[in-house]
Swiss-Prot record:
This is Conodipine-P1. Catalyzes the calcium-dependent hydrolysis of the 2-acyl groups in 3-sn-phosphoglycerides. It catalyses: a 1,2-diacyl-sn-glycero-3-phosphocholine + H2O = a 1-acyl-sn-glycero-3-phosphocholine + a fatty acid + H(+). Keywords: Calcium, Disulfide bond, Hydrolase, Hydroxylation, Pyrrolidone carboxylic acid, Secreted, Signal, Toxin. GO terms for biological process: arachidonate secretion; phospholipid metabolic process. It comes from Conus purpurascens (Purple cone).
Length: 178
């Protein structure tokens, strides 16, 4: 019986820690609509963590002194970081279903000319050759730039200048580090 009490206390402490972590994560989606677009786009789900931070930044940025430009720049940086996490697979976003996997294979074959062009360069490390490969229409970096341009051009109406400070209490950890 004496051994049971410490185990129960430890389980309770771990449970509370887990609940706080879940609550903290959930609070970061309070003002987020994900990567909302009228169409389903590649990388949309993969970029969701960056979109959540960006949505919170648009909602609470003025409260914490973060400009719209800083929100957008942090958004691009966060998406590029996600792309870099893919490592050597950064040429494409992770596929979500069989249809996307199949279309990805077909697209890879269709874009094989880009690889040939890059390999024909004097050096594979040639900057233009690398850019041609990384910014193909299915690349993670290509879509990161597209998402960034969309919010940069069309996001002005969504950036809130009249947010109630109470709405943003406890959300500073959900904003970009600027």
């Amino acid at each position: 019986m004496k051994l049971l009490a410490p185990v129960l206390w430890a389980m309770a402490a771990l449970g509370v820690t887990w609940l706080v972590a879940v609550d903290s994560k959930e609070s970061c989606t309070k003002h987020s609509n994900g990567c909302s677009t009228p169409l389903r786009l590649p990388c949309q789900e993969y970029f969701r963590p960056a979109c959540d931070i960006h949505d919170n930044c648009y909602h609470c940025g003025t409260i914490f002194g973060i400009s719209r430009k800083e929100c957008d720049d942090a958004f691009l940086k966060d998406m590029n970081t996600l792309c870099k996490k893919l490592g050597s697979n950064s040429a494409t976003c992770p596929a979500r279903g069989k249809r996307e996997v199949t279309s990805h294979r077909a697209t890879s074959i269709a874009h094989s000319r880009l690889w040939k062009t890059a390999l024909d360069q004097k050096s594979f490390l040639n900057r233009k050759a690398r850019q041609a490969i990384l910014l193909t229409p299915n690349s993670c970096l290509y879509w990161a730039n597209n998402f960034y341009m969309a919010v940069h051009v069309f996001g002005a109406r969504s950036y809130s200048r009249t947010t109630d400070p109470k709405d943003c209490q406890g959300l500073k950890h959900c904003l970009p580090n600027h």
